């Protein structure tokens, strides 16, 4: 667990550091003096001054900072911008003046962030999120170049299902659902999760030819045996409901299910299926926890449920692709995560997602622990690849979230700069 915490810290630290490096490199390219570029935060361990910049290593190796001359300390109005009435702003903020004068003793005022053109400032601020997208792209190339991509190939079609009635067959590759491009298996899963009842106009490829069909999900009520857990990637316990059969039996979030009554889960025989087939009798479940096999006894409970059923699924098997396709698929991979984050933010505003659906640092550590434990049987390289996949998601997430037009975020600053472009002069800074 300690190792996984360290991995999570390094991951988040790398993502934040690359974000700040984006600001740094574009600021330098635009002639802005970077007062300090630091790795980590907290007390400074040591620093080296080179040119305008002091390069620092700080105590806590988590993230970094890029502090530019004139960024926050030198304002637009300090450099001669006008207030709303076109008059010079008169300032009696002596502490601010003293800070400004102290800085100008050591730096050329022309190198201040605030002294640069609005388009230079926009480029500098936008560079942080852009570098996050570039980091996500680099890791996507590593992943797809190593193990391939996961096209939305139909891996199962149940008899007498809506999918079977629509003519879908195993091996068909879905490319569009309701005019939404589908490049990956996970895109279908995301779409179905939030549009389960929608009729799907599907475009798919079969033997090199394109076809279209319509799948209308079937609403049905079910009586099924359940444990009160949610499963991720077929074997991982993603959550355990309070006071459920699983909770009472000692099953924990993060457990990896090895077998149920001696039956190992497969893509064709998934855990919910195995549990439901028990008929409510006590079953023996073997889970892997902290590298050890743990055997538990649990009795499923009968649950009334309802669902919209299509009768087909895609398991996300990886397929190797050419170098050119690797680059193209990597762009699409980053685009998928950007789109997913944007849609998720929209769902928060519409109430489809709540604050409890967000993950903070503790959630990241839990996820890393889960990813590592689940990947261990496949070897160290697959552990790394799964961590890289998590970096792709987190880096794209940070890039998008930083572009939101909110105070203290890059997006909030960019909003005022674009207003400046329209107005032809800076927005007055409120005291």
List where the protein language model places each region.
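Juxtamembrane extramembrane loops of integral membrane proteins
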Residues: 71-78, 158-219
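Small-residue-rich helix-interface/hinge motifs
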Residues: 3-101, 401-423
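PDZ/PDZ-like peptide-tail recognition elements
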Residues: 122-155, 188-241, 247, 284-286, ...
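Conserved PDZ fold ligand-binding element
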Residues: 163-185, 246-269, 334
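Internal alpha-helical transmembrane segments
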Residues: 64, 89-159
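Functional transmembrane alpha-helices
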Residues: 103-119, 224-248, 256, 263-398, ...
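Residue-level signature of transmembrane alpha-helical entry/exit and packing/kink sites
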Residues: 1-4, 8, 116-125, 132, ...
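Alpha-helical transmembrane signal-anchor/signal-peptide segments
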Residues: 30-35, 147-164, 169
């Amino acid at each position: 667990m300690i190792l996984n915490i360290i991995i999570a810290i390094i991951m988040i630290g790398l993502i934040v550091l690359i974000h700040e490096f984006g600001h740094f490199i574009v600021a330098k390219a635009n002639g802005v003096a970077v007062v300090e570029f630091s790795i980590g935060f907290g007390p400074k361990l040591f620093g080296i001054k080179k040119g305008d910049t002091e390069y620092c290593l700080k105590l806590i190796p988590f993230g970094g900072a890029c502090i530019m001359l004139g960024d926050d300390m030198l304002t637009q109005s300090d450099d001669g911008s006008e207030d709303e009435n076109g008059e010079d702003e008169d300032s009696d903020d002596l502490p601010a003046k003293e800070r400004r004068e102290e800085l100008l003793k050591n730096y050329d005022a022309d190198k201040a962030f605030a002294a640069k053109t609005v388009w230079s400032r926009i480029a500098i601020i936008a560079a942080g999120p852009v570098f996050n997208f570039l980091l996500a792209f680099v890791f996507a190339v590593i992943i797809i170049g190593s193990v391939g991509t996961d096209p939305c190939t139909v891996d199962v079609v149940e008899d007498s299902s809506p999918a079977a009635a629509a003519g879908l067959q195993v091996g068909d590759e879905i490319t569009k659902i309701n005019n939404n491009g589908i490049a990956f298996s996970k895109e279908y899963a995301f779409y179905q999760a939030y549009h389960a009842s929608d009729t799907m106009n599907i475009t798919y490829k079969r033997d090199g030819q394109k076809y279209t069909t319509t799948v209308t999900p079937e609403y049905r009520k079910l009586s099924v045996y359940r444990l009160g857990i949610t499963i991720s990637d077929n074997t991982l316990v993603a959550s355990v409901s309070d006071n459920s059969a699983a909770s009472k039996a000692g099953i924990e979030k993060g457990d990896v299910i090895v077998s149920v009554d001696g039956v190992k889960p497969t893509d064709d025989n998934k855990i919910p299926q195995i549990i439901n087939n028990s008929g409510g009798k006590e079953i023996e479940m073997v889970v892997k926890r902290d590298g050890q096999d743990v055997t538990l006894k649990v009795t499923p409970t009968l649950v009334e449920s309802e669902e919209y059923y299509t009768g087909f699924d895609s398991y996300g098997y990886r397929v190797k692709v050419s170098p050119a396709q690797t680059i193209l698929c990597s762009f699409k991979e980053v685009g998928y995560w950007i789109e997913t984050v944007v849609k998720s933010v929209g769902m928060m505003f519409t109430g489809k997602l709540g604050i409890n659906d967000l993950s903070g640092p503790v959630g990241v550590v839990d996820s890393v622990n889960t990813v590592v434990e689940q990947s261990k049987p496949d070897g160290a390289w697959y552990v790394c690849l799964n961590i890289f996949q998590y970096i792709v998601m987190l880096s794209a997430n940070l890039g998008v979230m930083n572009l939101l037009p909110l105070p203290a975020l890059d997006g909030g600053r960019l909003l005022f700069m674009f207003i400046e472009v329209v107005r032809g002069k800076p927005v007055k800074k409120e005291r």
